[in-house]
């Protein structure tokens, strides 16, 4: 019983530590400057950073990543560390989704796939990150951007990733973030930000 309580205290302490780290990372960026950035390069870098981070912790993790980058995109003024954090959060969630689905699918073939598309859309840039994981239920959709809401097991998620991502895109970059999902089929996040 003492050992069980110690484990619970340790898990709770680790989660609190992770939450505080997330808040500190987010609050640091108040006076960040907007820099003309190659979003193709930045996005690609953080897509693969996420993949390798997940792979380092789970040697059995494997996924096909299909990338489409519009190399004619002009440089776009963004806060690079914030935009990259948004990409990282969405990619981490996509990796988690396909990995958790692959662990639950034993008998029929499942090929974990994440699609990343970055393109010019009139006077905006559109970034789409789509996975073929378990999808998101209607109940979860309603709470998706709520701070501290997570569907991950204790110790694996803080519930800050999507709320921070929404804030980065909408408040700091005058953009939009939308999510479409079909249970057991796909989840697709679409970010648009103005080209300026």
Task: Enumerate the predicted regions with their spans.
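Core catalytic ATP-binding domain of two-component histidine kinases
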Residues: 1-196
């Amino acid at each position: 019983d003492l050992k069980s309580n110690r484990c619970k205290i340790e898990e709770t302490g680790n989660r609190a530590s992770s939450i505080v780290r997330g808040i500190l990372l987010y609050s640091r960026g108040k006076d960040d400057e907007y820099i003309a950035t190659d979003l193709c390069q930045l996005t690609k870098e953080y897509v693969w950073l996420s993949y390798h981070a997940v792979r380092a912790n789970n040697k059995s993790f494997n996924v096909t990543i299909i990338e489409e980058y519009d190399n004619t995109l002009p440089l776009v003024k963004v806060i690079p560390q914030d935009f990259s954090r948004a990409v990282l959060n969405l990619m981490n969630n996509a990796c988690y989704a396909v990995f958790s689905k692959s662990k639950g699918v034993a008998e029929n073939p499942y090929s974990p796939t994440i699609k990343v598309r970055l393109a010019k859309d009139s006077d905006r840039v559109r970034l789409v990150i789509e996975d073929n994981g378990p999808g998101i239920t209607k109940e979860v959709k309603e709470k998706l951007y709520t701070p501290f809401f997570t569907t991950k097991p204790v110790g694996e998620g803080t519930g800050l990733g999507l709320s921070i991502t929404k804030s980065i895109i909408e408040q700091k970059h005058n953009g939009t973030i939308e999510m479409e999902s079909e249970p057991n089929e796909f989840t697709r996040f679409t970010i648009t930000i103005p080209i300026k």
